[in-house]
């Protein structure tokens, strides 16, 4: 009788463990599928343009137009602001309204550099913290890895659940400072004037 109880107890434990393992495999498989679809859509997109909104530390929202051309080229032109941003393969360039260089910073060790590469594999260059679906959005939380200068830098990406377009990104550095950009009126794989990525030097 004792052996019967012990065997039954072991059987129940095995069933519970099997259920947990099966559920975990299903969740992991679903996450992989979502990640693959987003990667496919992102890698098939060579150019992007639209409007962006940036939230500052004081909760003030500023806006402008953005243009991205892979690999590494982007232009963020702010509304009613004297300075804009143009990125290249090596630098984040701060420019005036006529695109003359004001200052520049290395881009290679920044998360945006990885996101704007020709092809991306999230699991290769980031640690996946979580993948969540809610309503019509997919939120992927990433952590930079294999990069000593970005230890602790977290990247939160929100995609549309219908067409896997990027809706917003938030980059949180190791000091807890957040850079949040929301994207609207997005157009993909369009022709972009090369002059938008030109940085002039006086």
Predicted regions and their residues:
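Bacterial N-terminal signal peptides that target proteins for export
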Residues: 3-15
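N-terminal signal peptide c-region/cleavage motif recognized by signal peptidases
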Residues: 24-25
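Cleaved targeting-peptide boundary
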Residues: 28-36
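A short, Trp-centered hydrophobic/proline-enriched beta-strand micro-motif
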Residues: 40-59
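Short, hydrophobic/aromatic-rich segments at coil-to-beta transitions
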Residues: 47-51, 71-75, 91, 134-141, ...
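A generic structural motif
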Residues: 53-55, 77-79, 95-97, 143-145, ...
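An acidic-aromatic
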Residues: 66-114
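Gly/Pro-enriched, hydrophobic low-complexity segments
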Residues: 124-202
């Amino acid at each position: 009788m004792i052996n019967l109880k012990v065997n039954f107890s072991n059987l129940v434990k095995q069933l519970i463990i099997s259920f947990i393992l099966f559920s975990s495999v299903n969740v992991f498989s679903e996450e992989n599928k979502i990640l693959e679809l987003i990667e496919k859509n992102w890698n098939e997109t060579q150019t992007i343009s639209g409007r962006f909104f940036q939230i500052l530390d004081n909760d003030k929202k500023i806006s402008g137009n953005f243009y991205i051309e892979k690999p590494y080229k982007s232009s963020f032109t702010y509304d009613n602001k004297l300075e804009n941003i143009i990125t290249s393969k090596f630098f984040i360039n701060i420019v005036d309204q006529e695109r003359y260089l004001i200052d520049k910073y290395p881009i290679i060790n920044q998360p945006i550099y990885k996101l704007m590469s020709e092809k991306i594999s999230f699991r290769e260059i980031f640690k996946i913290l979580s993948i969540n679906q809610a309503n019509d959005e997919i939120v992927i939380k990433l952590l930079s890895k294999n990069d000593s200068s970005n230890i602790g830098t977290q990247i939160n990406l929100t995609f549309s659940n219908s067409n896997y377009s990027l809706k917003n990104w938030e980059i949180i550095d190791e000091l807890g400072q957040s850079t949040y950009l929301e994207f609207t009126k997005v157009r993909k794989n369009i022709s972009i004037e090369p002059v938008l990525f030109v940085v002039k030097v006086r």
